Swiss-Prot record:
Regions that span the bilayer: none
Protein name: Serine--tRNA ligase, cytoplasmic
GO MF term (any one): RNA polymerase II cis-regulatory region sequence-specific DNA binding
Gene3D superfamilies reported for this sequence: Bira Bifunctional Protein, Domain 2 (3.30.930.10), Serine-tRNA synthetase, tRNA binding domain (1.10.287.40)
GO terms for biological process, alphabetical: cytoplasmic translation; negative regulation of angiogenesis; negative regulation of transcription by RNA polymerase II; negative regulation of vascular endothelial growth factor production; selenocysteine incorporation; seryl-tRNA aminoacylation; translation; tRNA modification
């Protein structure tokens, strides 16, 4: 995921100042641009010198051949005149005055200079890339410039009644319909582990079927993706911070052969966007085949580092969930990708409108965008039981930022193009099932249970097509369990012990002062 290097090169029509300004608007380090420009300039000088040295090496070989053809004496003198050693003034005439043995020595010295130059070039290339991959995509002009998404995300439009309040939050409702095992899930899988069961399994499957049918009717190709990716491929679709904060690493045998003890490093996907982005890696996509639209279905795995204490109960923010994703490869020409961007968010809006979920669309501030996104719109549903808007959909246009590193090119072949172009790539959530279930539970709650949304009825089993009944009391209204009481008593004892310790310390201080 990188920008075009020519954007940093003034002699190629680039504008480093524009990229520096973009970094500032993203509230990221603009100094990365200057470091990249410096490394790139040195890299280009190094490559130019290496090219010249190779030409001189070829000239030496040619001159040796001519001298051998003329049967000139080889000689045994390996001394090299001072004017030749600089290589900068080395010409065919200068070589013609040397013995074959001397020219061979010059050629060896040139080889050493080439190796040194190549080592420097590789070092500069790595330095340049380290800066390049941490510089974000160019921003769309409509992106709000701010580093505070809680205050400055721009509400673009609202659909439905986003003021109504209801009694229970999704945290209680998943228990009331007996569709969730949280404590046992945590014992088995750790923090945020859960079992989805009973009626909520049917509701989840209904959402998956309805979302896939909706996208299929709009020309999307359903695709079920791998759940893990090779490290070298994941590096091309994920930014560096995701490896620390989001992705799970999987270590396994590198071969199916029993005597092979090598190990392979892979990563669980955080979204089907990642494997679908790599689906056409190293390919040329023909203009007449675009857009290519995929409806990705996968389980997603996220560490949620940095989310400690947020949404710890229920199924809204979990480490594992199912998701249907819109993913599109688009032409880079004629504003086609931005037209597709609007089409994709509209598709998501119509899906949630059909489910009767109130929402607003927000334009995400520049400081909260990931490196790849040129612009991102979120659909945040109204949760009447929680009294808050919660994110259900993110829709991003990454332009050619992802495609460049994945080498997904636009057109036929390089021979038919004046300059290599890259396709534009877009992604948008259609339905993250656990979050959408939470939204349905809060919006469709009644005194007796959850009314099934009209569009999902045909996908639900007999007996559950109209109402999902409450079968358990709301946890918020229950007496504390024995375990909870024990934990509460333990907390009280610890607090009392701290108070006694503090009092003793104060008394000791008084004695000392006296």
């Amino acid at each position: 995921m990188v920008l075009d290097l020519d954007l940093f090169r003034v002699d190629k029509g680039g504008d480093p100042a524009l990229i520096r300004e973009t970094q500032e608007k993203r509230f990221k380090d603009p100094g990365l641009v200057d470091q990249l420009v410096k490394a790139d300039s040195e890299w280009r000088r190094c490559r130019f010198r290496a090219d010249n040295l190779n030409k001189l090496k070829n000239l030496c070989s040619k001159t040796i051949g001519e001298k051998m053809k003329k049967k000139e004496p080889v000689g045994d003198d390996e001394s090299v005149p001072e004017n030749v050693l600089s290589f900068d003034d080395l010409t065919a005439d200068a070589l013609a005055n040397l013995k074959v043995s001397q020219i061979k020595k010059v050629r060896l010295l040139i080889d050493e200079a080439i190796l040194k130059c190549d080592a420097e070039r590789i070092k500069l290339e790595a330095e340049r890339f380290e800066n390049l991959r941490e510089i974000g995509n160019l921003l769309h002009p409509s992106v709000p410039i701010s580093n505070d998404e809680d205050v400055d995300n721009k509400v673009e439009r609202i659909w439905g009644d986003c003021t109504v309040r209801k009694k229970y939050s999704h945290v209680d409702l998943v228990v009331m319909v007996d569709g969730f095992e949280g404590e046992k899930g945590a014992v088995v899988a750790g923090s945020r582990g859960y079992f989805l069961k009973g009626v909520l399994v049917f509701l989840e499957q209904a959402l998956i079927q309805y979302a896939l049918r909706t996208l299929g009717s709009r020309g999307y190709i359903p695709i079920y993706t791998p759940f893990f990716m090779r490290k070298e491929v994941m590096q091309e679709v994920a930014q560096l911070s995701q490896f620390d904060e989001e992705l799970y690493k999987v270590i396994g045998k590198g071969s199916e052969k029993s005597d092979d003890n090598s190990y392979d490093e892979k990563y669980l996907i955080a979204t089907s966007e990642q494997p679908i982005a790599a689906l056409h890696r190293d390919e040329w996509l023909r203009p007449e085949d675009l857009p290519i639209k995929y409806a990705g279905l996968s389980t997603c795995f996220r560490q949620e580092v940095g989310s400690h204490g947020r949404d710890t109960r229920g199924i809204f923010r979990v480490h594992q969930f199912e998701k249907i994703e819109q993913f599109v490869y688009s032409s880079p020409h004629d504003n086609k990708s931005w037209e597709m961007f609007e089409e994709m968010i509209t598709t998501a809006e119509e899906f949630y409108q059909s489910l009767g979920i109130p929402y607003h669309i927000v334009n995400i501030v520049s400081g909260s965008l990931n490196h790849a996104a040129s612009k991102k719109l979120d659909l945040e549903a109204w949760f009447p039981g929680s009294g808050a808007f919660r994110e259900l959909v993110s829709c991003s246009n990454c332009t050619d930022y992802q495609a460049r590193r994945l080498r997904i090119r636009y057109g036929q072949t390089k021979k038919m193009m004046d300059k290599v172009e890259f396709v534009h790539m877009l992604n948008a959530t259609m339905c993250a099932t656990t979050r959408t279930i939470c939204a349905i539970l809060e919006n469709y709650q009644t005194e007796k249970g959850i009314t099934v949304p009209e569009k999902l009825k045909e996908f639900m089993p007999p007996g559950l097509q109209e109402l999902i009944p409450f079968v358990k009391p709301a946890p918020i209204e229950q007496e504390p369990s024995k375990k909870q009481k024990k934990q509460h008593e333990g907390s009280k004892k610890k607090a009392a012990a701290r108070d006694v310790t503090l009092e003793n310390r104060l008394q000791n201080m008084e004695v000392t002062d006296a």
